[in-house]
């Protein structure tokens, strides 16, 4: 499906990006845009002075054949699953596919995970009592509880110039005003979980 850099609000208020075959390969199977949006998301977008609901909160694991060139921050040491046979040989029950994304972190349709880092790129949603929906390559879906208070706070932190959720956390720098990349000296159990379920070494 089509998407855009997350500060282009118009791209996230247009259901055609989800249901028009011109923009979305899933369009012939999924006719209803509402399936892409978690009902718990109450956020709105300012599009030309009008506030409208965001049409999508779910994103797809970027290691499932994400191919957007320069926008691809996937670690080349890890497998980019291009074929179903790639998935079948690598424990599909442990590989996440779609994930409920923090409303302030929704961007291109991919959910990127930095594999060898203490930094979040995209952030999971915590709207269901610190939990979010995660689907897996074997077809099962579960409500996954995120355990770190830093993850809970980060899911609602909008700008990289704002205060860190915890005084022990530091902004990683680089002037990234679009994605908050927070580092923690001790790591984050939720980030580790994402890394363990996003891909495997080649």
Q: What kind of feature is each model-predicted range?
A:
Residues 1-202:
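Short, well-structured segments within or immediately adjacent to enzyme catalytic domains
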């Amino acid at each position: 499906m089509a998407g855009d850099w997350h500060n282009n609000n118009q791209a996230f208020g247009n259901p055609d990006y989800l249901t028009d075959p011109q923009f979305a390969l899933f369009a012939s199977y999924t006719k209803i845009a509402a399936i892409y949006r978690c009902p718990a998301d109450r956020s709105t977008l300012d599009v030309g002075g009008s506030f409208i609901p965001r049409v999508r909160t779910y994103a797809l694991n970027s290691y499932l054949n994400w191919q957007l060139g320069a926008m691809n921050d996937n670690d080349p040491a890890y497998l980019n699953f291009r074929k179903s046979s790639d998935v079948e040989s690598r424990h599909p029950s442990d590989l996440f596919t779609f994930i409920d994304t923090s409303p302030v972190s929704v961007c291109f349709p991919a959910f990127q995970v930095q594999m060898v880092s203490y930094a979040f790129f995209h952030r999971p949603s915590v709207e269901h009592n610190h939990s979010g929906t995660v689907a897996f390559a074997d077809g099962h879906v579960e409500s996954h509880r995120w355990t770190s208070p830093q993850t809970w706070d980060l899911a609602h932190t909008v700008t990289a110039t704002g205060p860190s959720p915890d005084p022990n956390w530091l902004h990683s720098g680089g002037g990234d005003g679009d994605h908050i990349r927070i580092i923690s000296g001790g790591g984050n159990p939720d980030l580790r979980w994402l890394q363990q379920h996003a891909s495997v070494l080649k």
